[in-house]
């Protein structure tokens, strides 16, 4: 699968997108497909679930006097006040206000976020919220019409609507941080600064993605996080406050030029293993402090996004094999099973 280098949509000058449609994350019922609606009917169905997220950030350095501010979008996914948005939108945020479709502003707080998926969960206390229906569709088709809804540039007058098609599926792009975003929907629906975190909706009025990134050097190429890929993690974010990843007993670090220089590495790609615990799965399986992981079950690894995505691809198999730079044999790691989630309060 080709990995395309791209730029994330910034907050108040970044380039990000919208979110989506299916059953409530606390429900196990899959919603059957509705009839196709007109675009105005789709907008009428979803618009009240789309919010504006206004942020004030922490100064990037002590020399900065004024904190930066920004705006983005989000989508209500639960009557209890949970809102799905992008991690890049809330990173370094000092305070946050959420603008509802009614025009009301209410304080918001980040309750979970994950930089590898660029996903965040915001919580507000408000009454009469209208959650969107999330739709982790496995049958989304190239050429299918989709609608992006968000609040680009924090313009007055409510959310903005753009229409396009699914241009491609299962895209992977490289972020400026050197990590890879996977399972992206490519669309030609216009995504602009401030659209980040808003929904990409199919013509049944259900969210199939969360708008996240654009290709700045190309025309009509935007990307959304696939709801099919992120939906399994939403309940964990609501209950645990984080996305579940197995505790293998080491700290993975993406190898960058600065990491190479700091540790005197001769390998220029992969994931560096630090703080290996000899009593946990990685150490028991033969991983040593300072090892460089270059593949997981023969899937090449260039960064932490690659590493965790490869582990997810392992499915229910009990072990994975890590290929290590400069070592003849792999390390075989036994994967721990996740603890059962308790019902959300």
Predicted regions located by residue number:
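Conserved active-site neighborhood of the chymotrypsin/trypsin-like protease fold
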Residues: 27-30, 58-59, 76-156, 218-219, ...
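Gly/Ser-enriched beta-turn/beta-hairpin loop segments
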Residues: 59-67, 111-117, 155-158, 169-185, ...
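Terminal peptide-recognition signature
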Residues: 48-53, 74, 81, 85, ...
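Residue-level recognition of beta-strand microenvironments
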Residues: 53-56, 79, 86-87, 111-113, ...
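Active-site region of chymotrypsin-like
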Residues: 125-133, 161-219, 227, 232, ...
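Short, small/polar residue-rich loop motifs at catalytic or cofactor-binding pockets
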Residues: 69-71, 92-93, 192-196, 279-280, ...
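C-terminal recognition in membrane/secretory proteostasis and scaffolding
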Residues: 1-28, 41, 109, 141, ...
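N-terminal activation segment of mature serine protease catalytic domains
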Residues: 20-64, 70-73, 82, 95, ...
């Amino acid at each position: 699968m080709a990995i395309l280098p791209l730029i994330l949509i910034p907050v108040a000058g970044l380039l990000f997108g919208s979110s989506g449609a299916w059953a409530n994350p606390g429900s196990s019922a899959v919603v059957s497909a509705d009839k196709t609606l007109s675009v105005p009917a789709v907008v009428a169905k979803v618009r009240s679930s789309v919010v504006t997220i206004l942020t004030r950030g922490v100064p990037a350095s002590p020399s900065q006097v004024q904190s930066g501010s920004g705006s983005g979008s989000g989508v209500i996914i639960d009557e209890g006040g949970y809102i799905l948005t992008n991690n890049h939108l809330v990173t370094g945020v000092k305070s946050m206000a959420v603008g509802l479709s009614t025009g009301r502003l209410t304080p918001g707080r980040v309750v979970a976020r994950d930089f590898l998926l660029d996903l965040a969960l915001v919580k507000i206390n408000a009454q009469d919220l209208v959650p969107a229906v999330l739709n982790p569709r496995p049958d989304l088709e190239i050429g299918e019409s989709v609608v992006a809804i968000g609040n680009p540039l924090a313009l007055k007058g409510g959310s903005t609507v753009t229409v396009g098609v699914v241009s491609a599926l299962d895209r992977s792009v490289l972020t400026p941080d050197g990590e890879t975003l996977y399972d992206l929907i490519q669309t030609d629906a216009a995504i602009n600064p401030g659209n980040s975190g808003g929904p990409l909706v199919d013509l049944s009025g259900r969210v199939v993605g969360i708008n996240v990134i654009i290709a700045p050097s190309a025309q009509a190429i935007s990307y959304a996080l696939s709801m099919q890929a992120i939906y399994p993690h939403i309940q964990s974010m609501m209950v645990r406050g984080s996305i579940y990843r197995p505790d293998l007993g080491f700290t993975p670090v993406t190898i960058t030029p600065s990491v190479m220089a700091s540790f005197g590495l001769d390998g220029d790609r992969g994931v560096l293993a630090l703080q290996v615990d000899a009593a946990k799965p990685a150490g028991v399986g033969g991983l040593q402090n300072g090892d460089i992981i270059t593949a997981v079950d023969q899937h090449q690894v260039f960064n932490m996004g690659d590493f965790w995505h490869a582990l997810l691809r392992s499915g229910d198999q009990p072990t994975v094999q890590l290929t290590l730079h400069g070592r003849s044999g792999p390390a075989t790691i036994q994967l721990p099973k996740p603890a059962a989630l308790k019902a959300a309060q």
